[in-house]
Design a protein with these regions (language model features):
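Elongated, amphipathic alpha-helical interaction scaffolds
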Residues: 1-328
Length: 328
């Protein structure tokens, strides 16, 4: 059941999906946040992740989603989590959410037999908002309609309506976030990122961190460092941890990130120099033969590219430059 299988592009998506695509993390959080009667009816032990994303492609930098199925009585229902990490309120969010729900139903119909008695599964929509401020919107689709005064009763049969569960991290104190250790630490960290509070004690709760899987701990540290925090404060915070194993892991991840950053910098520098060499040749001699252009663009040795840039500026002909390339 899927609209697309696009890769994760955003750090918020990566951390959110790494944690909450695991049914045990999603179930432990959702059963505490959806209405009590619904939570009691859902068989959370059989919560199953469905593949795909239903979000508009141009909005995937601001939102991500997960779809689950689970039994309620003798029927399956769907639980849809829309994670909004945009920093502004969207008054028409319910309309966009409805669009995603329609896509889910259409996909469901494609994947299931459509006999005369076919009926759509109920979707329990949940919106998780990361914004640092509380939103003023009402989580009720019917509230979007401009119904003429005095006509509410007459028009009620024609006004579609559904509600969604709105969970706002801005309104949840750190200690009120419930779930598994991994789920709690992911949401605490995401909440703190919006308020520039990533060194707060709840984000470094050792009693929970020691229970978090290693791959999630690594993503948490990468997420924190990716927020461009003060590196000296990070080092001080890590050194204050009592668990030596956590200290070691955090600093190892930080070292890996620095090494990756240097490698990316070298790669980007090589690509820029290669483009500069080709541009210099084009300015001086016009069209650059494709084989020569391809050869230059695959080079990543910065020293060699710098030499070739000087050669490109000084050489008398493309043929002379080609000989220079051959000579290294």
């Amino acid at each position: 059941m899927a609209m697309s299988e696009d890769p994760i592009h955003h750090p918020h998506d990566k951390l959110f999906k790494a944690g909450f695509s695991r049914s045990e993390n999603a179930a432990a959080f959702l059963r505490e946040e959806v209405p009590a009667a619904v939570a009691e009816a859902v068989d959370w032990s059989r919560l199953h992740l469905e593949p795909g994303s239903f979000i508009d492609s141009h909005l995937r930098g601001f939102a991500s989603d997960l779809l689950f199925s689970a039994p309620i009585g003798d029927a399956d229902c769907l639980v849809y989590i829309l994670f909004e990490h945009q920093t502004r309120e969207e008054p028409m969010l319910a309309l966009r959410l409805l669009r995603y729900m329609v896509r889910i139903w259409e996909t469901w119909l494609q994947n299931h037999s459509q006999g005369r008695g076919a009926r759509l599964p109920v979707i329990v929509p949940v919106v998780l908002a990361q914004d640092s401020k509380l939103w003023s919107l009402t989580p009720d689709f019917a509230c979007l309609f401009d119904v003429p005064a005095g006509q509410e009763g007459n028009l009620a049969p024609f006004v579609p309506g559904f509600s969604f569960q709105l969970i706002e991290l801005a309104g949840l104190p750190f200690e009120a976030i419930r779930g598994t250790p991994a789920g709690i630490m992911i949401l605490r960290t995401m909440k703190a990122e919006r308020t520039a509070d990533l060194f707060a004690d709840p984000v470094w709760d050792e009693a929970l961190l020691v229970q978090v899987p290693e791959e999630i701990f690594e993503l948490l540290v990468r997420y924190i460092l990716g927020a461009d925090v003060d590196k000296e404060r990070f080092r001080t915070r890590v050194n204050s941890l009592l668990e030596v194993d956590l200290q070691t892991k955090a600093m190892t991840i930080a070292d890996q990130l620095r090494a990756e950053g240097r490698q990316e910098g070298r790669q980007e520098g090589g690509e820029a120099l290669a483009r500069a060499v080709v541009s210099a040749l084009e300015v001086r001699f016009g069209k650059v033969p494709e084989d020569l252009r391809a050869s230059i663009k695959t080079m990543r040795d910065l020293d060699r590219l710098e030499r070739l840039l000087r050669v490109a500026i000084e050489v008398e002909s493309i043929e002379d430059f080609r000989r220079g390339v051959g000579g290294g």
